[in-house]
Amino acid sequence: MITPIKNKKKIEIIFDNGKVIRKGPLLIKFHEFNDDENEYGISVPKRHFKSAVIRNKIKRQFREIINKQTLMRRGVSFFIIYNSPEKTLFAKLKGLTESLFKKRVDTTS
């Protein structure tokens, strides 16, 4: 099961030592830990979306996409940053996110 990151040290490790992949408006930073938990974080910058309603909607959409991921490798924690001033349709977000997961986060190498 994938849960939100609660540990501040893990977030710091992800941002300092993690690998980065980009595609379109998405940036995913991830790091492999030696535990069996998969954890995630989501960031939608306030400078792009002033309205909290829109930021929360985008975060809910990402949570829905992440919770439906079933093939994720154990021990991978990641942080998704949505870095675009335009809103994107859910289907496009889902496609971008899944392609990035297949590209790097899901791979077993």
Q: Where are these predicted regions, by residue range?
A:
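Positively charged, solvent-exposed patches that mediate nucleic-acid binding
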Residues: M1-S109
